[in-house]
């Protein structure tokens, strides 16, 4: 997997929900969604010290919440990879 061959890569995982339900439900759900992906990667050898998770609830839809397909698209996790800066001496 990528994280084994790229030890200086940080992984950012962001969970999202659709707009069904309240923020009190969606915000923790989006965090749990991101943490689930983190746990999946950890079991497969990812260094959890290099993984950051965040939940954004329903605040950043990529599709309309007025349709089933739009709501399904909004229930997602995004993964971003970034090379960690290495201090030079």
Name each region found by the language model:
Residues 1-2:
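Short, small-residue-biased leader/transition segments that mark boundaries at the very start
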Residues 5-6, 40:
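Amphipathic, soluble alpha-helical interaction motifs
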Residues 6-9, 46:
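Short phosphate-binding/catalytic loops that engage adenosine nucleotides
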Residues 14-89:
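Periplasmic OmpA-like peptidoglycan-binding domain that tethers envelope proteins to the cell wall
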């Amino acid at each position: 997997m990528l994280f084994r061959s790229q030890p200086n890569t940080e992984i950012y995982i962001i969970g999202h929900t659709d707009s069904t339900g309240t923020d009190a439900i969606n915000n923790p759900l989006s965090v749990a969604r991101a943490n689930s992906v983190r746990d999946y990667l950890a079991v497969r050898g990812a260094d959890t010290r290099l993984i950051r998770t965040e939940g954004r609830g329903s605040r950043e839809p990529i599709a309309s919440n007025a349709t089933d397909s739009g709501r399904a698209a909004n229930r997602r996790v995004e993964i971003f990879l970034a090379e960690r800066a290495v201090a030079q001496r």
